[in-house]
From Swiss-Prot:
SMART domains: EFG_C, EFG_IV. InterPro entries: EFG_II, EFG_III, EFG_III/V, EFG_IV, EFG_V, EFG_V-like, EFTu-like_2, G_TR_CS. This is Elongation factor G. It comes from the Bacteria. PROSITE patterns: G_TR_1, G_TR_2. Catalyzes the GTP-dependent ribosomal translocation step during translation elongation. During this step, the ribosome changes from the pre-translocational (PRE) to the post-translocational (POST) state as the newly formed A-site-bound peptidyl-tRNA and P-site-bound deacylated tRNA move to the P and E sites, respectively. Catalyzes the coordinated movement of the two tRNA molecules, the mRNA and conformational changes in the ribosome. One of its GO terms (molecular function) is GTPase activity. Residues 8-291 form the tr-type G domain. GTP binds at residues 17-24, 90-94, 144-147. It comes from Chlorobium phaeobacteroides (strain BS1).
Length: 704
């Protein structure tokens, strides 16, 4: 199968937005106009193509980032009538699913940032924007819902500038706003575009309406000044009053978008079919192809020596698995991005992280959840493979003869957990397998068991996250389960540095056990997890026993000394020890490591940590005092407040333990007129009174 379009004509994009900005509807319209869809799906009637899980259709929110592909020939600009392939990853807007956004952004080249013309920049827009900044993803802005009462394109653009610190440059302005939204003025061509009232997909080009001439000139000057600032040749022409051509404006706008210095801003109403075609033209015109993004870097599996791969079919194959999904018909699907080379169906790939070779049974390109078989996939493609058994999210797939490890994805730790138990014996057998499959798909979902109670615990990023997963157990895996009350995922760490000896000796006739280790424990900065340093000199602890010492320490870290919670952010250095020729074994050194760590942790000023959430509440002014008082009573710290879109907002840092059931309280406190978002911020030390209560509750089970 030959390549359908050249690599320079491929666009890998995501549509990123706050929940309710019209993201799924916009994606539906893209598929409709590019000929992939014959009937438009609406989110509010549960018919949207990209929202393919049952819960998504019911809740009207997108949970999993489905990937789809389509073709588009721009109707104007520097790429007019050239066939392009657009691969779209639809990303969720709900804060509990930020992991989906994170992994999508990792494999994208560009993004369309969607904003609501009424709400402007919402809290989740900020979260997603920060994630996109982290990966330096070039963006265009599309202000949607221009037909809504209260729509204000200029206020939305101002909010993008002020709240996101970006440089949005309108390349269109609206003709009418709200119910009288009729079309746009194209500032590059200085023409008016009026959409057909009924359909919106047809339009006519007109002269700029008389009452908008002054405004259009003002915004065209704004655009020309913005592009002149990033290009010296254009600046000279502009200052000397020479004409700047359309092609020149587009070329410099493209360069500035690719380097992140400008965000071209457009507007429309996806629901009313107005503006989507011009947004597609802008995707082609301003967002990068894999060629623009350039080489991807990684390292050799055996060492840290750097390797790069050019985006070319002639390079060795390298791809990144960014999502695992279970398909009811073909089983496990591994979504991956091809960075270089060609991969054929039926061939073998190396998982560079595990060292295992696996056969790719089938290759598919997805249109939402419909599949199209492919004989081969090429550099720049996003596709799904069937038949890969041991691949996890973030693994590198590559040519076995030319291995490379691409940068891994880092996912946040879960902050909330609940106990789950099967309703019947039949469910019991299926529960473990089903939970395992869900954990494979979602790196922020963890399954563990409480050794004392024997309960199965599931952990995730929020109440909605776990609710959706329990719902999937029932629908997809036909497993009925009861769930307990949500529990906070507390952690422990140390504040001091100490040295300690761990000794395990058993002499009871015959072969005994002997292991002695001297370790130093010290705190690491938050989020670093665990670090082990082997500083043994002269073989006082034989090399073969050193991994066992680390294993024993990690075992002990699962059960901290304050209240039995997992320990994090600790560095342990093994610097001395003793062994016995006959009695020493891996087991004796593992136990010595465990004893040593427990003893050291007790002396190293151990503390209990709790997850702190970043909470933002948007409320009518009359409830502001009540909302702030309530947040303070929840041990919250008010970080800021202000006005947005006619309402007040409050930002606060609040312990997760105090936020269960908050939505119900907020609803009754404000007659349902306020809403809030919440995301994990950091782990902080628990106040003494709370720590004592938790210790009492746990019976300080870790202190034995």
């Amino acid at each position: 199968m030959a390549r359908q379009v050249g690599l320079a004509n491929v666009r890998n994009i995501g549509i990123m937005a706050h929940i309710d900005a019209g993201k799924t509807t916009t994606t539906e319209r893209i598929l409709y106009y590019t000929g992939r869809l014959h009937r438009m799906g609406e989110v509010h009637d549960g018919g949207a193509t990209m929202d393919w899980m049952e819960q998504e259709k019911e809740r009207g929110i997108t949970i999993t980032s489905a990937a789809t592909t389509c073709f588009w020939e721009p109707k104007g600009g520097n790429f007019v009538d050239v066939k392009h392939r657009i691969n779209i990853i639809d990303t969720p807007g709900h804060v509990d699913f930020t992991v989906e956004v994170e992994r999508s952004l990792r494999v994208l080249d560009g993004a369309v940032a969607l904003f609501c013309a009424v709400g402007g920049v919402e809290p989740q827009s900020e979260t997603v924007w920060r994630q996109a900044n982290k990966y330096k993803v070039p963006r265009i802005a599309y202000v949607n819902k221009m037909d809504r009462v209260g729509a204000d394109f200029y206020a939305a653009v101002k909010a993008v500038k002020e709240r996101l610190g970006a440089n949005p440059v309108p390349i269109q302005i609206p003709i009418g706003q709200g119910e009288i939204f009729a079309g746009v003025v194209d500032l590059i061509r200085m023409k008016g575009i009026i959409y057909d009232k009924e359909d919106g997909s047809t339009f006519e080009e007109v002269e700029i309406p008389h009452d908008l001439e002054t405004e259009a000139k003002h915004w065209r000057i704004n655009m020309l000044e913005a592009v002149s600032e990033v290009d010296e040749t254009l600046l000279e022409k502009y200052l000397e009053g020479e004409d700047i051509t359309e092609a020149e404006v587009r070329k410099v706008l493209r360069e500035a978008t690719l380097n992140g210095s400008i965000i071209p801003a457009l507007c429309g109403s996806s629901f009313k079919n107005k503006g989507v075609q011009f947004m597609l033209d802008a995707v082609i015109e301003y967002l990068p192809s894999p060629v623009d993004v350039g080489s991807v870097t990684g390292h050799h599996p055996g060492d840290d020596s750097g390797i790069s791969r050019k985006p070319s079919d002639d390079e060795p194959f390298a791809g990144l698995a960014f999502k695992i999904a279970t398909d009811p018909f073909v089983g496990k699907l591994t979504f991956f991005r091809v960075y270089s080379g060609v991969l054929e169906a039926g061939s073998y790939v190396l998982n560079a992280l595990t060292g295992k070779k696996e056969r790719v049974g089938r290759l598919m390109q997805m249109h939402s959840n419909k599949r199209e078989d492919r004989d081969a996939v090429f550099a720049g493609d996003i596709a799904a493979a069937v038949g890969l058994k041991d691949v996890k999210t973030g693994d590198t797939l590559c040519d076995a003869g030319k291995p490379i490890v691409l940068e891994k994805m880092v996912f946040p730790e879960p902050v909330i957990q609940i106990a789950i138990e099967p309703k019947t014996k039949a469910d019991s057998d299926k529960l473990g397998v089903s939970l395992g499959k869900l954990a494979e798909e979602d790196p922020t979902f963890r399954v563990s068991s409480d050794e004392e109670t024997g309960q199965t615990l599931i952990a995730g990023m929020g109440e909605l996250h776990l609710e959706v997963l329990v719902d999937r157990l029932k629908r997809e895996f036909k497993v009925e389960a009861n769930v307990g009350q949500p529990q906070v995922a507390y952690r422990e760490t140390i504040r001091g540095t100490v040295e300690h000896e761990g000794k395990f000796v058993r002499q009871s006739g015959g072969k005994g056990q002997f292991g002695l280790v001297n370790i130093k424990v010290e705190p690491l900065e938050e989020g670093k997890g665990y670090e082990f340093v082997d500083a043994i000199k002269g073989g006082v602890v034989p090399k073969e026993y050193i991994p066992a010492v680390s294993a024993g320490i990690q075992e002990a870290m699962k059960d901290g000394v304050v209240a039995g919670y997992p320990v994090q952010d600790v560095k342990v250095t093994l610097y001395d020890g003793k062994y016995h020729d006959v009695d020493s074994s891996e087991m004796s050194f593992k136990i010595a490591g465990s004893i040593g760590f427990k003893g050291a942790a007790r002396k190293a000023n151990p503390v209990l940590l709790e997850p702190i959430m970043k909470v933002e509440v948007i409320t009518p002014e009359e409830y502001l005092g009540d909302v702030m008082g309530d947040l303070s009573s929840r041990r919250g710290h008010i970080d800021g407040m202000g006005e947005r879109a006619g309402a007040q907002f409050v930002k606060a840092s609040v312990p997760l333990a105090q936020m269960f059931g908050y939505s119900t309280v907020l609803r009754s406190m404000t007659q349902g007129r306020a809403n809030y978002t919440m995301e994990f911020e950091c782990y902080n030390e628990v106040p003494k009174s709370v720590a004592e209560a938790l210790q009492e509750k746990s019976g300080v089970k870790g202190d034995g």
